[in-house]
């Protein structure tokens, strides 16, 4: 059995434009996130738990986009835009696993900010490298476990004869739309998985930031308040982008499914968010900006010498 992707433009000129546009964005995503990872691993001033989480987030987003974007680029230039049942299940499994890990990791980063601002004296003792590694590994394993359960459930359902998917890749809503035995139970099962991956981490993030805001209001120094807020604002911006798109995609009922709207939101969190994350963290964080600048300078000097 094969699925056919129906969302690609039929005009040959648009194929080339789409390929060039997506290639450019993908190149910027890989470059930006690799710069973040390299800067964090080479700059001693960034050897803290906050930057360890940021480096892990960038690493996950490199893998996250690599699951779908190369396939999108290949399909853009191919006449037959198909994928096998196994290929679709594999793509969805990795995409959901890494996307869920991303959400769980953002919750861990919120906890890190909570400890740093609300318990600054205990921060070095509480947020050890061992704990950070455990939280990152737990995020990935939890995402993988949730993904395997969801994908096994979806692909155990019968699919209709016309396997046309109104999308660019195998995401949950468009694939569920071609399931023949759609029922309230199936929709609720997918919703439970979405709540575990999106709503629960978002609740933990909201709780962390409630305590953070309360702590910030107690800081009398304007400079101290501004510094604390600047370290949180980057993370909060990324959270709103990521969770806003994911909630719109996965927490809405299937009756409100709109293929065109769905595709646009998918492009935002598949290409837009991974592209903006390095920019947000680099531009809003002076330490990160300085580290990236030094890495680029060293690279330019080594090439010129």
UniProtKB/Swiss-Prot annotation:
Cited Gene3D superfamilies: Rhodopsin 7-helix transmembrane proteins
Matches recorded under InterPro entries: GPCR_Rhodpsn (IPR000276), GPCR_Rhodpsn_7TM (IPR017452), Olfact_rcpt (IPR000725)
CDD domains linked: 7tmA_OR10A-like
Cytoplasmic membrane side: 38-45, 112-130, 209-228, 284-305
Residue intervals annotated with topology Extracellular: 1-16, 67-90, 152-188, 250-262
Recorded superkingdom: Eukaryota
Keywords, comma-separated and alphabetical: Cell membrane, G-protein coupled receptor, Membrane, Olfaction, Receptor, Sensory transduction, Transducer, Transmembrane, Transmembrane helix
Keyword Cell membrane: yes
Gene Ontology MF term list: G protein-coupled receptor activity; odorant binding; olfactory receptor activity
Transmembrane segments: 17-37, 46-66, 91-111, 131-151, 189-208, 229-249, 263-283
Main subcellular location of this protein, as a coarse class: membrane
Entry GO terms, CC: plasma membrane
Membrane topology classification: Multi-pass membrane protein
Location of this chain's protein in the cell: Cell membrane
Family: Belongs to the G-protein coupled receptor 1 family.
Function: Odorant receptor.
Name the record gives this protein: Olfactory receptor 10W1
Organism field: Homo sapiens (Human)
Gene: OR10W1
